[in-house]
């Protein structure tokens, strides 16, 4: 009987420890993502929350793999994860928020033969999309 109680206590203690570790890890991940979001918004002046709808509306996911976008698994254009770590936008312009926004609005300005179409997205909308991409 005493052995059974000891096992139960150890099992409960282990479960509590695992849950506590999970809570700490989840909180840390949330803090990291929240910080990345704040930095991306400051860099671009965009609104991350509006980006998923814009990405769907303008068909970005039809060509690109985009993290966090359901169905964002296109294979025509380059994948859009870790944009903040890239040296170039579209392979031709130095990666900066201004260049990213200009590229999203009018890729042919940088590369006349680019396969990426001008979608008609506004500069404000491009800022939102850029903020989202830089935050991921």
PLM feature segments, named:
Residues 4-31, 109, 115-136:
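C-terminal capping alpha-helices of c-type cytochrome domains
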């Amino acid at each position: 009987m005493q052995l059974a109680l000891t096992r139960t206590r150890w099992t409960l203690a282990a479960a509590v420890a695992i849950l506590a570790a999970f809570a700490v890890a989840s909180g840390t991940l949330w803090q990291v993502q929240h910080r990345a979001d704040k930095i991306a918004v400051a860099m671009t002046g965009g609104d991350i929350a509006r980006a998923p709808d814009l990405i769907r509306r303008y068909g970005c996911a039809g060509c690109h793999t985009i993290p966090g976008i359901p169905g964002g698994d296109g294979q025509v254009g380059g994948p859009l994860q870790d944009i903040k770590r890239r040296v170039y936008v579209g392979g031709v312009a130095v990666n900066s928020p201004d260049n990213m926004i200009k590229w999203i609005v009018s890729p042919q300005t940088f590369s006349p033969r680019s396969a990426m179409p001008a979608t008609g997205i506004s500069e404000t909308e491009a800022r939102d999309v850029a903020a989202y991409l830089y935050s991921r």
